[in-house]
Each structure stands twice: as C-alpha cells, then as structure tokens.
Amino acid sequence: MSEHDDTNETRVDAQVAALVTEAQDQLRPTAVPARREALDRDEHLIKDAVLRMGSLVEEAIRDASRALQTHDQELALRVITGDAVINEAQRSVTRLISVTIATQSPVARDLRYLLTLDHVMYELERIGDHASSVAKQVLKLAPEPPLRDYIHLPAMAEQGAVLVHGVLRALVDIDAVAAREIAVLDDEIDRMYHETFDEVVALMRADPANVERGTRCIIASHYLERIGDRATNIAEDIVYLVTGDVE
C-alpha cells in the first residue's frame, strides 16, 4: 500500500469517527429530557387554550338559553358577536398544534393526544356556531309572544351546556367512563327535540298564525340538538384518547 493510500484511509477513518461522535452527541440522554420538556410545555399550553375556549362555548350556550327565556335581544346579540372570538381562538390553537407537530415530531400517545385536541377544538367551534344560530332565532322570536313557552327549547339549551361542561371535565381528567356517560345525556336532548318538533307542528297546523314562530322554534331546536351531538363527538374523542378505540 502506498503512502498516498495510507493518507486517504486515515482521512476516511477520521471522518467516520467524527460522524459517530456527532450521532452519539445527538443521542445523549440529556437531549431526550429537553425534547420531552418542550413537548410537555406545548401540550400544556394547548390543553389550557382548549379549556378556555370550551368555557367560552359553554357560556355562549347558557347566554343563548337565558336570552331565549327572557326575550333579551341584547344578550342574544352578545352571543352572536362573541362567536368571532371563539372562531379566532380555534384558528390560533390549530396553528399551535400544527407547529408543535412539525417541530416536536410527537409519536404514539403524544400524537394521538394532539390530534384529539385538534378535533375537540373543531367540535367546540361548531358548538359555538350553533349557539350563535340559536341566538339569531331569539332575535326574531323575542318581539312576539312565546309559542307555548317554546316547548322544550330552554331545557334543551340547559342540557346542552351541561353536556359541554361534562365533556370538558372528562377531558381534564382524561376520564373515558365519564365521557361515555355523555351519550346517555344526549339521548335526553334527542327526546326533547322530537317532542318539541311534534308539538310545534301541531300548533302550526291548528293555527296558521303560528307558522312563522313555529318555524323559528324548529330551527332553534335543530341547532340545540346538534349541540348535543357534537358534545357526544367530543366524548368519543376522549374515549379514543384513553383506549385507542373508535366508538
């Protein structure tokens, strides 16, 4: 072997050694806790933001319910304008989740957790939209005498707020058992929706003067029923987070 070959071999060995050292540095135990700490911090920030948004949504439902019962048009307007805040919160947290996934490269349970929170945000935003839609019907119903006190609409709204509060509590506790109970509560909203629909249609048939108010009531009841369905979707997300099972 020539002196030139020896020099080349030495150079290659040095390069290989440098690459090995660099790889070992990247795999040192200190790097893992640092990444874990950053991911934990981001997950904590995201979860807090989701819960804050959930509180806004729950408040919107309760305010829509009060506006419905008291014919409070000003309160209904606040629910409608407040929906923009909920929408912006959803967009902000979605961006944060995307950045966290891109920069932290979460896997397994962490990735499932972030994707679950992203879908929870989507469902909460839609619930906020439904609360706003109920408030818009309140603006049209408020000037007129209530049609049989709107049948079950106030109770449906209150039950919807209870469901949202319940799924947020289950999310905080990561509690699949509590999440599964939400579906049972949603059945009650479904029952009230069908009873309201049937009774309002009967009132509309009995007196054509009830048609416009009755139509508004049916529209509002539809949105309230959807609130229950979306709360159930969040509950199913929590079950998936805990068990990995899709229900």
Regions found by a protein language model. Give the residues of each.
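Cytosolic, long alpha-helical scaffolding segments
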Residues: 1-247
